[in-house]
Amino acid sequence: MLSFLQKLGKSFMLPIAVLPAVGIILALGREDVFNIPFVYQAGTAVFDHLPLIFAIGIAIGISKDSNGAAGLSGAISYLMLDAATKTIDKTNNMAVFGGIIAGLIAGYTYNRFKDTKLPEYLGFFSGRRLVPILTAIITIILAGIFGVVWPPIQSCINSFGEWMLGLGGIGAGIFGLFNRLLIPLGLHHVLNNIFWFQFGEYNGVTGDLARFFAKDPTAGTYMTGFFPIMMFGLPAACLAMVVTAKPSKRKATAGMMIGFALTAFITGITEPIEFAFMFLSPLLYAVHAVLTGLSLFIVNWLGIRSGFSFSAGAIDYVLSYGIAEKPLLLLLVGICYAAVYFIVFYVLIKALNLKTPGREDDDVDEVLDENTVQDVNENIMLKGLGGKENLQTIDHCATRLRLTVKDTALVDEALLKKAGAKGVVKSGGQSVQVIIGPNVEFAAEELRAAVK
């Protein structure tokens, strides 16, 4: 089950990757920016069809070779599922959840039947051409079931969503806490998609993220509080790790941490920072999770409201500024959070003598020069994963290599970190996650090339 959820979380990355560009288009077309209606409507169209985009993206993400036939099957499945369930009961609105179901149907159908050979007189429909046909048949059967069972499920989801929204800041704080606690397992994407794309409805769009860009005055509850963490808190934690580093390693540590901090501040990608201390001190990471939950509670209590299309970095802060509420106060909260994070990290690192970057007893965690990254991926990283023979599947999400290996005991964490990995997670069974950062796609391609 854990492996399935991790794979599902990874598959969310393709459709989510579309949203930053769409967010920029939407922002540029808004009345308060350039007031270009056709540009604004072009961006709105994507948010209006998020379920279809998720169906296509998840189908491709689930498929073993990311083939377009899986994406086509996902689109067919969603269109059929949506139309059929609404015919059975007009109140049915599976929204993004319908897209997820359709993507799963198409992805697993593709994996199972993509190599199927039919008799010669039906040979044209063999292999990948067979997948959309079988997907359609399976979808019709499941649509009949979902058309009947979905209304009570939808009622439960709506009730839970209304209950969480009714909790206000407390509910937002609980979400923020678990959002961070699930990162080590890579399951935070699953939680995020429930809150950001499913809960609440406004003018036909669902989820906190889509509702915010549709100008729902109540949206932003589950996004706003991440800005103080990602733009200010974690960059301040980087500063604390630089200050507490050994004098002989402070310059090298600063070079690495400045890059991490800028990435977090500008884009909102924070995993490279979090994995620098996550496993060194679970207590420190737990404090970080609590502070995240507290941030979501505080900004809600102060009546601050903002949102993002990708993550809570400076880019999305600027793009959302025109439709945000009290955006300047959000910066003040962020500055306060920077002070809190610096003090907490400085004190705990010193008091617990944590071996954060720059405080190691040996050089196993040193990151090699950027000029040797390609060689690292082909040699040291491959060796750290137990060699070609140990690798079964190679995939990735936004910041992590997601691998399946024959024997996790052969995975050498010290070697992987020496190769530039920010962290390693053995998440049960044969699954291994290697945290790389925003350039993970290139690392995955180089690793695939190395094992051929």
From Swiss-Prot:
InterPro entries: Glu_permease_IIB, PTrfase_EIIB_Cys, PTS_EIIC, PTS_EIIC_1, PTS_Glucose_EIICBA, PTS_IIB_1, PTS_IIBC_nag. Its EC number is 2.7.1.193. Its main location: membrane. GO terms for cellular component: membrane raft; organelle inner membrane; plasma membrane. It is an enzyme of class 2 (transferase). Residues 1-361 form the PTS EIIC type-1 domain. The EIIC domain type-1 forms the PTS system translocation channel and contains the specific substrate-binding site. The PTS EIIB type-1 domain is phosphorylated by phospho-EIIA on a cysteinyl residue. Then, it transfers the phosphoryl group to the sugar substrate concomitantly with the sugar uptake processed by the PTS EIIC type-1 domain. Interacts with FloT. NCBIfam families: EIIB_glc (TIGR00826), PTS-II-BC-nag (TIGR01998). This is PTS system N-acetylglucosamine-specific EIICB component. The gene is nagP.
